[in-house]
Amino acid sequence: MKKLYLSGEAAALKEAYCELRGVEAVTGGIAEASNELKIKGVEIDYNPKKIDICELLKTYFEVVDPYVLAEDPLLQPAVVYCSSEDVPQIEYYARYMQSRGAEPAAALGNLIMNDSITPGREIRRMLVNYGRLVKFTGEEA
């Protein structure tokens, strides 16, 4: 079993993930990452033999709009992982997202992706933070 932490409204994320094959549990709470990143969202317990991080991220970006600035900074799009072996899959998905538009800048655990597929050829910026888990505090039952 593995864990992944995603920022966003817990109720919407729980609804999106609770029926996915390979997802064993979804718990709301606060996650803190090594790069001073702190998010409010969900902890996803999943079986990597049944679902991978890319599929989890695909579902995430169907629920969370990474182009809209959240009023609460804890709800800005972010991915917090437990193991460095998860980073290649997160970066693979980021490269997939990059291929949809202009090449982004990336630095210090933050991915800034441009999506040029908009009416009028405007470029929308998508900011996704990611970092390694330091602490997770689940919501009270």
Enumerate the predicted regions with their spans:
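Flexible coil/turn and secondary-structure edge motifs
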Residues: 1-141
